[in-house]
Amino acid sequence: MWRLKIAEGGNDPYLYSTNNYVGRQIWEFDPDAGTPEERAKAEEARQNFYKNRYQVKPSGDLLWRLQFLREKNFKQTIPQVRIEEGEEITREKATTALRRAVQFFSALQASDGHWPAENAGPLFFLPPLVMCMCITGHLDTVFPAEHRKEILRYIYYHQNEDGGWGLHIEGHSTMFCTALNYICMRILGEGPNGGQDDACTRARKWIHDHGSVTNIPSWGKTWLSILGVYDWSGCNPMPPEFWMLPSFLPMHPAKMWCYCRMVYMPMSYLYGKRFVGLITPLIQQLREELFTQPYDQINWKKNCHQCAPEDLYYPHPFIQDLIWDCLYISMEPLLTRWPLNMIIRKKALELTMKHIHYEDGSSRYITIGCVEKVLCMLACWVEDPNGDYFKKHLARIPDYIWVAEDGMKMQSFGSQQWDTGFAIQALLATNLTDEIGGVLRRGHDFIKKSQVQDNPSGDFKSMYRHISKGSWTFSDQDHGWQVSDCTAEGLKCCLLFSMMPPEIVGEHMEPERLYDSVNVLLSLQSKNGGLSAWEPAGAQDWLELLNPTEFFADIVIEHEYVERTSSAIHALVLFKKLYPGHRKKEIEDFIAKSVRFLESIQTSDGTWYGNWGVCFTYGTWFALGGLAAAGKTYNSCLAMRKAVDFLLRIQKDDGGWGESYLSCPEKKYVPLEANHSNLVHTAWAMMALVHAGQMDRDPTPLHRAAKLMINSQLEDGDFPQQEITGVFNRNCMLHYAAYRNIYPLWALAEYCRRVPLPS
């Protein structure tokens, strides 16, 4: 039986931590664990997911929840409530529903104070890891039989009805993910016609019907070339000499968005080496299975720019293809031949590996994310198959693995701090401190222990890194990468706790550490007033024309975001109130500029585009919260009035809100089909309206939404899993499994706290 283990490092000599592994969450299979009843419940969860896989595609994240609730002997003791047709919501019923949600959610807290949760959904995360383990000869040790069983389950359960796999679990089929998942099945032992529900046969038919893997986008071409199923001569150049460019050039690596930089760093190393794994009989078979013409007759150069229409979100402009062609024809032939291959290429490869080793060490070999993790790990193995660098990478693979009722998947890198920051704020909003003091104390302890204590090591600016001391990451302290809104939410939590008795919530954070957090936030504001995410923005916008991917947008440079900006306003307004003498003028200017930024990027229909959640509902909740925190009101702020008008206009007949993920790629509001509501979207809209004072004008829309929320609550106090709610890079969705608890709970708390209700 699978079990989730918290804050454990084990005895691996290649594993190390900055805070004794606080926040670490790893899965282990214990063949002797669990009673027959417990195993039956897990199997029932799997079968229920499979039956409903085309209706609800994100997992309910049930396996660890069943484990935690069992270990804590949880039993919902508060009776369920329901609001009947025409019935008025009373304070008693609303508070009862809220207390039920709090009691259930509190039982899901881990021993170190965080709330575990799946953070996955893209279907290109896991296959490269399987391919990497196959190439390096570690497949059997990293993925023994039970792991393989769960990986295959995940692949089967998320195969679309047409036989393909989408970029993410709710997406239409794409060549990229269909090819990767087909290869993954074959590596894990399925035959050409094997797999549940004829998975391999259906997938191969989809691939052939859509032109074969010659139409796979550039990332796919890279991975297939590494595996030996494609040829490097069919890829656009990724010269490692890029890392040798002088810093005054506009396309210097330091000016790139950190994720883009960290993907193409190891990719350029592998490209520069033209590394290809061992050509085994399986690879020979894949060469026959994935193409519609003989492998040795393919014109690779002709396919460099080919991309299946299903994968194409960002068509490359002509100037970009021209640059690739010039590098392909004129530069690469010179750099791969003597003497330049020994003078320039060799030096470029060494410099690239220097950067890779620095980034690996700075993150305790977690690296910035799962795509980058696998590429950096493979680069370390190519450099030295028996070296310590690769062994340290192997030790951190469990940090990325997640298991749920839909199988085993690879996480983005974990959302421990992000989820916990919002969970704490939701719980604090309930005014139930007397009932949940221990929960709050543990959460406070986790947040304090998760703050990053130092900047990256050495001359970090020469390695293109920004300050991180005082920040919070998205996941845990070991990860090490500062994120502006994670920092703002962490700071806000610590400030809220500082206003509470330490005998209830534990020792308050020292002011100097709060000052460090403020320093990080102030450093990330751009001239336009907006806040970037990881590093200061400021590179020229035209560089986005060089976006080398086909299925993402806005990935080349850092940008400013409504969510990051609003989070920072919230935190700094509260900080200014509690520490009025610290950098007062800078903070006041920061807030004023941030407000102007929010007002300037509002869309014509009154919304804000959400960059990290679905979508206009999410962005508008953040924006209205930021404006309200800065002192704006419905009467004084036109932007608020326009936003409220929009939210009221799109409220559904059942009282809720529901937005399709298609809003994100299409950049226009798209409702869910069939007038369907989503409870997370409903919670965001409710809180947005509360920020704008809707209860003082007409509370009816809030009452209607609260009725839906209360009546949707499950018997144990949980809420049902619905559509996916997270997004990144415009076009790829991310499943935040904790959202279905955090936000309905928070919305009910704000409703009970801010909306007048009869006794």
Swiss-Prot record:
Protein name (Swiss-Prot/TrEMBL): Germanicol synthase
Keyword set, alphabetical order: Isomerase, Repeat
Species assigned in the record: Rhizophora stylosa
Enzyme Commission code: 5.4.99.34
Pfam family name, one: SQHop_cyclase_N
Gene behind the chain: M1
One GO process term, biological-process aspect: triterpenoid biosynthetic process
Assigned protein family: Belongs to the terpene cyclase/mutase family.
Active site (catalytic residues): 485
